[in-house]
Amino acid sequence: MGQSKKLNKQPRSLSPLVLLSGISKSFDGKEVISQLDLTINNGEFLTLLGPSGCGKTTVLRLIAGLETVDAGHIMLDNQDITHVPAENRYVNTVFQSYALFPHMTVFENVAFGLRMQKTPAAEIAPRVTDALRMVQLEEFAQRKPHQLSGGQQQRVAIARAVVNKPRLLLLDESLSALDYKLRKQMQNELKALQRKLGITFVFVTHDQEEALTMSDRIVVMRNGVIEQDGTPREIYEEPKNLFVAGFIGEINRFDATVIERLDEQRVRASVEGRECNIYVNFAVELGQKLNVLLRPEDLRVEEINDDNHIEGLIGYVRERNYKGMTLESVVELENGKMVMVSEFFNEDDPDFDHSLDQKMAISWVESWEVVLADEEHK
């Protein structure tokens, strides 16, 4: 988002494991994936993120071999697997429902895949024990699924998937059935397990916080196409368009109009009716409409108690929400636009707990803003 928040974009020297090239897929005449290209690297935790119906689960099912492509190719470890049956792909999937066999013990559930592959009997017990030890369920080996918590069942499903030593593990919304506290715990455990195993994980979710917490890389999808592909920080701090900006966390969008270019980096603009300097790294014209994007935590607010010269936008506190570590305020600008501001709680600041209807000045550190061309006026 600019100078002091500039991201370190060293090239990632990872080797590709999966290549999707020109993938298209339709159901009942409706195209759900359109000419999609995606590289998944060895050993990374990649998340496919997007709203319901964006095509993320279809991509997962195409990689797994549970659906067939209409066009394009899928490569795994330099082998074309586009038409290889699912059972021969060295890819395992953990579904939202876990689908454990209720009549089998935990041990038997994990061993099932090995027996189906006709693994020598002498290998089965040590491999199952190793897999259960990895997910910290060794002592639960003789229990039935109904005797386990939701989080434990989820770990059994993962152990069953990794015991076959897949090159790739696919997880389809596999934490969504858990309660909030257990989800948070499982996010940390899943990421730690992925690091320990060194297996490539591809995780599908619509939960932005989950994606930011767990991923090495996030692929944001909408209507069957990739909107942005980057690290969690890149996606959060440097969104490429308004959809990504609005989908990942809270963000304020300000309307701006170019007044003049000041230098190579900065433009003088009218932002919601107030003149400000903004950082714009693309060519603009006089009078051009822009979008200025700022996260609530990137805004600074100051109470106005006199008529001294005021920098920034002017508004009035309309709502306050105490969130423990932060105080979130809704400020109404003079033109009626509502702005969200998030401040870290500071009980030693006498002006911190703002009164309703208090007049405020809103500003930000120059260059922390993201500026995008107005998509409606290109």
From Swiss-Prot:
Record's subcellular location: Cell inner membrane
Subunit annotation: The complex is composed of two ATP-binding proteins (PotA), two transmembrane proteins (PotB and PotC) and a solute-binding protein (PotD).
UniProt enzyme class: translocase
Topology within the bilayer: Peripheral membrane protein
Ranges where the ABC transporter domain occurs: 18-248
Species of origin: Salmonella typhi
CDD domains assigned: ABC_PotA_N (cd03300)
Predominant place of localization: membrane
PANTHER family: SPERMIDINE/PUTRESCINE IMPORT ATP-BINDING PROTEIN POTA (PTHR42781), SPERMIDINE_PUTRESCINE IMPORT ATP-BINDING PROTEIN POTA (PTHR42781:SF4)
Superkingdom of source: Bacteria
GO molecular function: ABC-type putrescine transporter activity; ATP binding; ATP hydrolysis activity
GO terms for cellular component: ATP-binding cassette (ABC) transporter complex
Keyword Membrane applies: yes
Family: Belongs to the ABC transporter superfamily. Spermidine/putrescine importer (TC 3.A.1.11.1) family.
Annotated positions binding ATP: G50, P51, S52, G53, C54, G55, K56, T57
EC number, UniProt record: 7.6.2.11
InterPro entries linked to this entry: AAA+_ATPase (IPR003593), ABC_SmlMolc_Importer (IPR050093), ABC_transporter-like_ATP-bd (IPR003439), ABC_transporter-like_CS (IPR017871), Mo/tungstate-bd_C_term_dom (IPR008995), P-loop_NTPase (IPR027417), PotA-like (IPR005893), PotA_ATP-bd (IPR017879)
Catalytic activity: ATP + H2O + polyamine-[polyamine-binding protein]Side 1 = ADP + phosphate + polyamineSide 2 + [polyamine-binding protein]Side 1
Keywords: ATP-binding, Cell inner membrane, Cell membrane, Membrane, Nucleotide-binding, Translocase, Transport
UniProt key word Transport: yes
Protein name, as recorded: Spermidine/putrescine import ATP-binding protein PotA
UniProt function note: Part of the ABC transporter complex PotABCD involved in spermidine/putrescine import. Responsible for energy coupling to the transport system.
S-S pairs: none
